[in-house]
Swiss-Prot record:
GO terms for biological process: electron transport chain. The lineage of its organism: Eukaryota, Viridiplantae, Streptophyta, Embryophyta, Marchantiophyta. This is Ferredoxin. It comes from Marchantia polymorpha. Binds 1 [2Fe-2S] cluster. Pfam families: Fer2. Residues 2-92 form the 2Fe-2S ferredoxin-type domain. Belongs to the 2Fe2S plant-type ferredoxin family. Ferredoxins are iron-sulfur proteins that transfer electrons in a wide variety of metabolic reactions.
């Protein structure tokens, strides 16, 4: 289990996420309302930016290598591989 800190427009939340659980799903289970659309890694609605830690988002098909290198993540298909911090609601930054 990893500690995932989510920095949202309304404040900060820390949730526990299993290494085989998508970050978006865990956030919803914790009662948080994060943006999403396709839930398949094919759009940018759920995009966040990792500011600390690592994720596995090998199922994504939307972000390019430069965006991933900059830390962008699709929370609907991202698994934590360490404790991490994500700034949520980053779709506008990608467009």
């Amino acid at each position: 289990t990893f500690k995932v800190t989510l920095n949202t427009p309304t404040g900060q939340s820390v949730i526990d996420v299993e290494d085989d659980e998508y970050i978006l799903d865990a956030a919803e289970e914790a009662g948080l309302s994060l943006p999403y659309s396709c839930r398949a890694g094919a759009c940018s609605s759920c995009a966040g930016k990792v500011t600390a830690g690592e994720v596995d988002q090998s199922d994504e098909s939307f972000l390019d290598d430069d965006q991933m290198d900059e830390g962008y993540v699709l929370t609907c298909i991202a698994y934590p591989t360490s404790d991490l911090t994500i700034d949520t609601h980053q779709e506008e930054a990608l467009i």
